Amino acid sequence: MKRIAIIGAGLAGLTCGKALQQAGHDVVIFEKSRGIGGRLATRRAEPFYFDHGVAAFTASDDDFQGFVNQLLAEGVVAVWAVDQATPDNPLVSTKPHSMPRVSGCYSEYYVGIPAMNAIGKHLARGLTVRRNTRVGAIIDHHPIFNSWELLNDKGETLGQFDWIISAMPVEQAKSFAQTSLHTKVLNKYALMPCSVLMLGFDTPLALDYEYAKIEGEDIDKIIVNSAKPHREGGYSLVIYSTPAWTNRHIEEDKTACINHLTRAASQVLGIDLSTAAHKDIHHWRYATGEAVNLQSGDHQLGYLLDSD
């Protein structure tokens, strides 16, 4: 039996921890936030609920489909048969109800129920997860003690372990790289940011679709979050910015960001969204990943990138 530390309690960290625990190992997961699940996140602002991280997901791999099927059987996720659309004009559409349906796109997605954060909570059952714990350093005690030691951001020890597994965004993992090989591999990947605007309305909007892929200059997609299965609460929209927009505005005033994206989305839909009863925004500095400069054989190095 090995004593194993996993840094990060997102989907990758939790599934890895579960598998290692089931194999008989002593696993401790460290999470810097108070919540778990990473981008499988949900925010509540009564009476509204917003899945403000991963909106939904698909399964195109047999192994992952098996994992999803188990979650379906356990009542943790449900199929979302999406009414999906794309605007006639990626910048302006005065008749949102006339948006044509997308051809060749997924029509079924999976979502956590009753919210996306239910997946992380389910996977964490039975695992030792130390929340609100930021790892500050990794100390190599090889070959004398044949172990690794974790320190928190105050320099206090978190324990010694046989293995340490990084399940954090690649940009954060770079600070813990132990060798030039680690750095070289991590530099092959980049993470792009995303801002998520959350709008809650007292009265439903006149939209005939639940998912609109915009791909405009500022807006990437618009989702009627309250239309997902098993959702409670008021009518809610979740609006995702493009990475380029977030790069330009992430350090700006929160209210200014909310107003900017609200105006941009209003222009796309042809509806005044400023009437929302609730408005909020969340910036993800590390939202989606892309591989850069990959070479043959890189997949054999044993690194896993979760880019949603």
Q: Which residues fall in each region the model found?
A:
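Active-site substrate-recognition segment that forms the wall
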Residues: 198-249, 256, 260-269
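Short beta-strand to alpha-helix junction loop
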Residues: 56-62, 94-122, 251-257
